[in-house]
């Protein structure tokens, strides 16, 4: 495996002796050690991202592998995202009905459900669900390839592992997350309407027209496409944790776990920032 100072193009950076990917439990002897470990990890992540971008824009492009990742990340995540979205829609509908009825604002119920699902619960639930499923899968898969030296073999065969393994998965995450979010939103709104229709007569047309009354593209598109940033975070961290793991089978488990925990954490933090930016630029 090439060292970070090697001039070999596309080489995977090997951790220095005793250095490993940022663990889930950051147990260190001092706060200074914690801070230095985090910034070292974050710097390595930035270098990894630059190497992936450079490989992604350099031919040849791995179209076949990208399409395979579309299916793996998008199609196979759809049932779980749909189920989570539907459950969220039902719970939100019941809670919103109870709260708005207490304040005499039951007429605003469809709009409250629509805006809550599209603006926040749909995107963040989709991001966390995909982070759990896809993050663990990518982290474990690439970590297994690393400890069994398959990545070394790919590099030895003159194939850039950043392009074949990382860029395709990250790009698939970026492109699939908005589509999965739309599917999750649709399921959430549909089940939100069902939950209301079981309580009082309310047609789907009435629910949609009342819920989307006054809505604009500024209300709909930015919250949906912020999940592309979630996709970047999930794919980048999962690939990074997987491709730099070490320690045999135990390392594979640590890579999978840390991929899920770290990507979920950064998705939540990114959501806070993106919500504020959306409110500033799309009031």
Regions found by a protein language model. Give the residues of each.
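Hydrophobic alpha-helical transmembrane segments of multi-pass membrane transport proteins
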Residues: 109-152, 237
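Short, membrane-interfacial amphipathic segments enriched in basic
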Residues: 20-64, 241-242, 246
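Membrane-interfacial helix-loop-helix connectors in multipass membrane proteins
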Residues: 95-119, 186-228, 236-258, 278-283
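Hydrophobic alpha-helical transmembrane segments of integral membrane proteins
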Residues: 163, 167-170, 262-282
């Amino acid at each position: 495996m090439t060292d970070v100072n090697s001039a070999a193009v596309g080489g995977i950076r090997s951790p220095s002796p005793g250095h490993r990917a940022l663990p889930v439990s950051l147990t260190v002897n001092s706060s200074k050690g914690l801070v230095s470990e985090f910034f070292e990890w974050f710097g390595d992540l930035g270098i990894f991202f630059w190497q992936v971008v450079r490989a992604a824009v350099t031919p040849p492009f791995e179209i076949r592998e990208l399409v395979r990742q579309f299916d793996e990340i998008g199609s196979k995540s759809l049932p779980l995202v749909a189920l989570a979205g539907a459950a969220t829609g039902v719970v939100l509908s019941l809670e919103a009905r109870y709260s708005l009825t207490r304040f005499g604002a039951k007429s605003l119920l469809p709009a409250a459900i629509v805006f809550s699902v599209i603006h926040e619960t749909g995107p963040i639930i989709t991001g966390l669900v995909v982070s759990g499923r896809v993050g663990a899968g990518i982290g474990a898969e690439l970590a297994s390839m690393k400890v069994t030296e398959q990545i070394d073999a790919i590099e030895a065969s003159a194939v850039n592992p950043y392009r074949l393994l990382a860029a395709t998965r990250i790009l698939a995450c970026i492109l699939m997350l908005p589509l999965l979010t739309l599917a999750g939103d649709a399921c959430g709104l549909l089940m939100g309407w069902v939950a209301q229709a079981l309580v009082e007569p309310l047609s789907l047309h009435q629910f949609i027209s009342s819920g989307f009354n006054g809505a604009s593209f500024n209300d709909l598109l930015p919250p949906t496409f912020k999940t592309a940033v979630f996709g970047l975070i999930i794919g980048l961290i999962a690939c990074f944790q997987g491709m730099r793991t070490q320690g045999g089978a135990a390392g594979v488990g640590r890579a999978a776990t840390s991929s899920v925990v770290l990507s979920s954490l950064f998705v939540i933090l990114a959501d806070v920032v993106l919500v504020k930016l959306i409110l500033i630029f799309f009031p």
